[in-house]
């Protein structure tokens, strides 16, 4: 179940190679991930999930920094019957409890990298709330959105049928490579100011009209559950 980590490390290796050759990107790129050699599995519908001995809040504290202006979260998202596509799928942008529209340029870049039409997937309110609140989440791909005010987009590595990501033989190297290439392309354009994860004016208008949704980034009125 290490597709996301492998993609992140691959993107880091590519950026280091580019830098060594004098091809430096404008802006800073922060790449963070975690690798656990003995992660447990836990029951989840429709297939078992890979769990972690470290809580999501702890991982967010180490992986999501205040200096980040935007976050691209890469994660295996195969254990569901919602996404019926093999390859990569892009989430809508999530910011401070709001699910915003899919960023046009992010979608165009994904089409360029994969050579296929853009595939996106539905994000529920539950999916953008913190783990530990007792509700169903499709997976942890958008958990970084609970730890930052910056816009977050999930890049899901997906399958055409429900596949346990923790199963052996379930990783597809070409999809991981495409995810890494996409991350590099996003970093190039975002750092150069040629790409936005969201429309800031539109977001400000939503908040002015309907109010803050930042309470969805918290446990709300009840204590955390196991």
Model-flagged regions — what are they?
Residues 1-34:
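Alpha-helical metal-binding/catalytic segments enriched in His/Glu/Asp
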Residues 2, 47-48, 56-58, 89-100:
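Flexible, glycine/proline-enriched loop segments at strand-loop-helix junctions
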Residues 21-25, 62-66, 144-149:
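Solvent-exposed alpha-helices and their adjacent loops that cap or buttress functional pockets
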Residues 29, 33-40, 78:
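Acidic, glycine-rich active-site loops and adjacent beta-strand->loop/helix elements
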Residues 35-51, 140:
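Short, electropositive alpha-helical surface patch
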Residues 47-72:
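A glycine-rich helix N-cap at a beta->alpha junction
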Residues 70, 76-223:
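Active-site-adjacent substrate-binding region
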